[in-house]
């Protein structure tokens, strides 16, 4: 049997056999290999699906405690998504390097060291301790509102700046109330009693007229004079009603005139005030009105200049008076000379 089989194998021609097909056998082998790969991939996918389902179930269990219809659940889900994306990007950066290459453990350790070292590697040029000691040792400079003039500039400008800075200080040093005078007067004019009380400038025409009306013995402060005038009208307050615990005396039982508020008492008080008030004539009232008008229109300086000039009315009156005196002197001399001849 063996020799016959060997003879048949020697006489067999594979090219003449119609059933012999080596290409189909190779294709069948390749297809079997690809089928095996597909089966392995399918098994991996089937393994991954349960893991995804488990993750989804865990997330649903975590979200079960929140009200999914409110804003808190939506915000929580958004934060989870952001956290997942950040962790995924960080993992991709750590695992992959330039050109898509996978990093080794040593490369990852070197990158972590670089991230952790935030201090400057160069030389430090500022000594913080010395700077702090210098700041503490310097004296505290008080803050001034006025700027100091530059000494390197023109000295004339420096003098102007100093004088302008000293002017407000001198103005503050002066008491603003010292330049004012209080006018308080009561006068009777045209059958009516007028009472005035106001503050005017000390150098005004009205103030000068008021001080001149008080006389030579008038005090320097007009307010003191006004208080002296009204001191007689002031009275100390007294009790309106007597207490039940006070002893009954003649002084307490006397009638209180200051509590009489009838019309007759008011008229009597007005008459008493009118009798005490100074009666002014037309000339004196005109002087007062003229002084008020001069201060109101600001004619004081102009009137002073006009009064000092030669063309003023006062100067002309003085000239006429001197001329009249000279004529009278010449006439007297002529009479004396004529009497001596006779």
Swiss-Prot record:
InterPro entries per UniProt: BCNT-C, Swc5/CFDP1/2
Pfam families: BCNT (PF07572)
Biased composition (Acidic residues): 8-20, 33-43
Occurrences of domain BCNT-C (ranges): 260-341
GO biological process: chromatin remodeling
Comp. bias regions, Basic residues: 78-87
Superkingdom assignment: Eukaryota
Protein location: Nucleus
Region (Disordered): 1-126, 142-178, 214-238
Disulfides per UniProt: none
UniProt KW Methyltransferase keyword: no
Major place of residence: nucleus
GO cellular component: Swr1 complex
Subunit description: Component of the SWR1 chromatin remodeling complex.
PANTHER family: CRANIOFACIAL DEVELOPMENT PROTEIN 1
Family membership noted in the UniProt record: Belongs to the SWC5 family.
Name this protein carries in UniProt: SWR1-complex protein 5
Organism name: Neurospora crassa (strain ATCC 24698 / 74-OR23-1A / CBS 708.71 / DSM 1257 / FGSC 987)
Name of encoding gene: crc-2
């Amino acid at each position: 049997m063996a020799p016959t089989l060997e003879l048949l194998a020697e006489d067999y021609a594979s090219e003449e056999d119609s059933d012999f097909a080596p290409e189909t056998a190779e294709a069948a082998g390749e297809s079997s290999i690809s089928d095996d790969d597909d089966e392995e991939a399918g098994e991996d996918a089937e393994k991954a699906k349960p893991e995804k389902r488990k993750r989804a179930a865990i997330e649903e269990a975590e979200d079960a405690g929140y009200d999914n219809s409110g804003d808190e659940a939506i915000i929580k889900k958004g934060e989870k998504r952001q956290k997942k994306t950040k962790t995924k990007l960080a993992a991709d950066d750590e695992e992959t390097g330039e050109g898509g290459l996978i990093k080794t453990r040593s490369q990852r350790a070197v990158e972590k060291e670089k991230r952790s070292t935030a201090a400057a590697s160069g030389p430090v040029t500022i000594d913080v301790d010395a700077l702090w000691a210098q700041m503490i040792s310097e004296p505290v400079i008080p803050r001034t509102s006025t700027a100091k003039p530059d000494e390197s500039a023109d000295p004339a400008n420096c003098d102007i700046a100093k004088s302008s800075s000293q002017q407000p200080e001198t103005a503050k040093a002066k008491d603003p109330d010292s330049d004012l005078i209080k006018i308080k007067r009561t006068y009777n004019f045209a059958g009516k009693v007028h009472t005035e009380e106001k503050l005017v400038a000390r150098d005004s025409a009205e103030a000068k007229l008021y001080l001149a009306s008080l006389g030579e013995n008038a005090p320097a402060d007009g307010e003191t004079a006004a208080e002296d005038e009204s001191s007689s009208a002031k009275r100390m307050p007294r009790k309106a009603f007597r207490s039940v615990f006070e002893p009954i005396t003649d002084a307490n039982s006397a009638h209180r005139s200051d509590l009489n508020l009838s019309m007759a008492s008011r008229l009597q008080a007005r008459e008493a005030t009118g009798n005490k008030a100074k009666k002014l004539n037309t000339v004196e009232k005109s002087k007062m009105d003229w002084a008020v008008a001069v201060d109101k229109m600001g004619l004081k300086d102009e009137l002073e200049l006009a009064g000092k000039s030669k063309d003023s009315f006062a100067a002309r009156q003085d000239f006429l008076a001197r001329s009249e005196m000279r004529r009278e002197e010449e006439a007297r001399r002529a009479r004396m000379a004529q009497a001596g001849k006779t």
